[in-house]
């Protein structure tokens, strides 16, 4: 009898999860992805400082090599952004 109750609760939880998560799955964080097919590079300038160039604003340059490899080519990825309608939301996160 207990097994039947546990099974019913589990099935209900899965169905509820499916109903509430389908809207999230259809949302795209890409929008108009300005970072698609953009490449970036890492080099050292004349002063010996690391220079990363090639990605537009709002994009992150990701390299598939170690941090000490120069020069290196990477790929640009768009950073995810979030917004809130609650004025106190930022203050709560900073605490």
UniProtKB/Swiss-Prot annotation:
Record key words, sorted: Complement system impairing toxin, Disulfide bond, Secreted, Signal, Toxin
Tissue expression summary: Expressed in salivary glands.
Signal peptide: 1-21
Keyword flag rRNA-binding: no
Disulfide bridges in this chain: 35-59, 40-61, 55-76
GO molecular function: toxin activity
Domain of life (superkingdom): Eukaryota
Main location: secreted
Compartments in which it is found: Secreted
GO CC annotations on file: extracellular region
Chain's role: Complement inhibitor. Prevents complement-mediated C5 activation by binding to C5. Binds C5 at a different binding site than the other tick complement inhibitors OmCI and CirpT1, and the drug eculizumab.
Family the UniProt entry places it in: Belongs to the RaCI family.
Protein name: Complement inhibitor RaCI5
Species this protein is from: Rhipicephalus appendiculatus
